[in-house]
C-alpha cells in the first residue's frame, strides 16, 4: 500500500474507517545511511500526502482518528534509564530523523487543522515473519544456513524488545482510550544486549539442529 497515493482519499470515503493505523514506513537504520532519499520520500513526503487526504476525510467523519506509529529511535541514544514522552527528540540516523519529522508533521496537523491524530513511539519489535534484515531473524537465518553471525561493535548495545502481538494490543488500547494530540511510548521494560540475544539463539538452536562450522559470532567494527 502506497500511503502517498491519491487513491487513498477515495479508499477512505468508500470504506469510512473509524481509525487508520499508519504503520507504513522505511525502517532499517543501515539502509537509511546508504539511501536516505527513500526514507525521506516514504516517511515524510508520503505521510504529508496521507495527512492531506485524512484531513479532508475527518471533516466529514467526526468520529475517526489516525494513529501514527513511530519509533523510540527518535530520542537518540538513551544512556540511562528508559525514554519517556517528555524526552527531547535527538535522532542519530536518517531513519530516525525521517520518523521524527513525520511525528512533528502529524502533531502540527493536530494543532493547525484539528486533525484527530495520536502519535505512538515503540521500542524494537520482533515476531513471526519479520523482515530478515532485522537482528533476530537475521541471526536465526544465518544459523540455519551455516553463516557467520554479524554483531556490531562489542555486542553490548542494549535494546528494549517488544513482541509484535503485544505492540498490537497496546495500539488497540490507545485507539480505545488514547487522547487526540498525545504521544504514547510503547515498550516492554525488557532490555537485552545484542550479544546475549545471539548467544541465546545459538544455545536454543543447538537443542534442535546440528550447527554448521561457520556458525560463530563475527564482530563488526
Tell what function each PLM region has.
Residues 137, 143-221:
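C-terminal substrate-binding subdomain of Rossmann-fold SDR/epimerase-dehydratase oxidoreductases
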Amino acid at each position: 500500500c502506497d500511503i502517498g497515493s491519491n487513491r487513498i482519499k477515495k479508499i477512505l470515503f468508500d470504506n469510512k474507517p473509524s481509525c487508520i493505523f499508519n504503520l507504513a514506513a522505511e525502517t532499517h537504520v543501515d539502509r537509511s545511511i546508504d539511501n536516505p532519499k527513500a526514507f525521506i520520500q516514504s516517511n515524510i513526503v508520503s505521510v504529508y500526502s496521507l495527512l492531506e487526504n485524512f484531513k479532508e476525510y475527518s471533516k466529514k467523519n467526526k468520529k475517526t482518528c489516525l494513529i501514527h506509529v513511530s519509533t523510540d529511535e527518535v530520542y537518540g541514544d538513551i544512556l540511562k534509564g528508559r525514554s519517556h514522552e517528555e524526552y527531547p527528540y535527538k535522532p542519530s540516523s536518517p531513519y530516525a530523523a525521517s520518523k521524527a519529522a513525520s511525528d512533528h508533521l502529524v502533531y502540527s496537523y493536530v494543532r493547525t487543522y484539528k486533525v484527530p491524530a495520536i502519535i505512538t513511539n515503540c521500542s524494537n519489535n520482533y515476531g513471526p515473519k519479520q523482515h530478515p534484515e532485522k537482528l533476530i531473524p537475521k541471526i536465526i537465518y544465518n544459523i540455519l544456513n551455516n553463516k557467520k553471525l554479524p554483531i556490531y561493535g562489542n555486542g553490548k548495545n542494549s535494546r528494549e524488545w517488544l513482541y509484535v502481538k503485544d505492540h498490537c494490543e497496546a495500539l488497540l488500547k490507545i485507539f480505545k482510550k488514547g487522547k487526540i494530540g498525545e504521544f504514547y511510548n510503547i515498550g516492554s521494560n525488557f532490555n537485552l544486549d545484542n550479544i546475549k540475544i545471539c548467544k541465546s539463539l545459538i544455545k536454543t538452536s543447538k537443542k534442535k539442529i546440528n550447527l554448521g562450522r561457520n556458525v560463530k559470532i563475527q564482530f563488526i567494527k
